[in-house]
């Protein structure tokens, strides 16, 4: 069985039974409401989500599509900050068993302080981080030693444009999982994956990497979900869930709506 478990703050995904696939969801902290972070996370845990990506809003998010950009804008207007987010996560730390992964750009993390950021991750029950604009050399020289000190996983992204040499290097120097982006373009829902993407998934699988993979960006229905889960340890859904959360204003309703979409 694939289990996502926390040992201290270690996140391990074990992929031994191909029938059990992970589903991870992303939402932007502070959207639609400033104080709703804990409610969204607890609803996800109740509904059986395996892992949660909590977005740190930033004013210039390069990889984000319009849905997540606009969620970030709302969150910033609502007053969400890195400090506020850590305080919210700390409040629910004892109630939440799921692995939490913070996804945010380098600028707000550096502004908070890299060491302070990873220390706060431990204190608030965060297992891993995804920093889309973190150059790999800076990860190795600056970020990895600090993350390792606090036993926090730094998850790296790969795209169809990432060279095989770089993918092997990432596989060797990171733990947790590799985030396979199904497209080099910005995030957003898609109705299906074309042949080129499926060939890319097959190619990555043929590399026999030591880290499990999760596929994200563009998953919004049964076809894209199945395709992602057939080709990796699981799927990550962002834009579709964020849209539903904004429309309903209620995490339980948004999750029910998402599960409905994933059946179609």
Segments predicted by a language model, with ranges:
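Glycine-rich phosphate-binding active-site loops on the catalytic face of alpha/beta enzymes
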Residues: 51-61, 126-138, 178-189, 231-250
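C-terminal helical cap(s) of enzyme catalytic domains, especially alpha/beta-barrels
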Residues: 64-72, 143, 240-264
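Active-site beta->alpha loop and helix N-cap motifs at the rims of alpha/beta catalytic domains
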Residues: 56-58, 69-134
């Amino acid at each position: 069985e694939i289990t996502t478990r926390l040992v201290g703050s270690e996140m391990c995904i074990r992929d031994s039974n191909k029938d059990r696939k992970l589903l991870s969801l992303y939402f932007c902290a502070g959207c639609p409401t400033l104080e709703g972070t804990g409610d969204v996370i607890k609803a996800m845990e109740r509904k059986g989500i395996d892992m949660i990506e909590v977005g740190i809003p930033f004013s210039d998010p390069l990889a984000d599509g319009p849905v997540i950009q606009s969620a970030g804008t709302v969150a910033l207007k609502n007053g969400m900050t890195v400090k506020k987010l850590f305080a919210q996560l700390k409040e629910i730390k004892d109630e939440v068993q799921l692995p939490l992964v913070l996804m945010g750009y380098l600028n707000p993390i550096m502004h908070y302080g890299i060491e302070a950021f990873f220390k706060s991750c431990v204190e608030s029950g965060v297992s891993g981080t995804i920093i889309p604009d973190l150059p790999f050399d800076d990860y190795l020289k600056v970020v990895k030693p600090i993350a390792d000190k606090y036993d926090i996983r730094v998850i790296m992204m790969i795209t169809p444009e990432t060279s095989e040499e770089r993918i092997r290097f990432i596989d060797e120097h990171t733990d947790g999982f590799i985030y396979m982006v199904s497209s080099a373009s910005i995030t957003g829902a898609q109705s299906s994956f074309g042949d080129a993407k499926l060939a890319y998934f097959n190619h990555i699988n043929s590399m026999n990497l030591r880290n499990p993979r999760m596929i994200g960006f563009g998953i919004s229905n049964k076809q894209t979900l199945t395709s992602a889960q057939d080709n990796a340890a699981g799927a990550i859904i962002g834009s579709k869930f964020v849209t539903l959360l904004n429309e309903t204003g209620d995490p339980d309703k948004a999750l029910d709506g998402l599960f409905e979409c994933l059946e179609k």
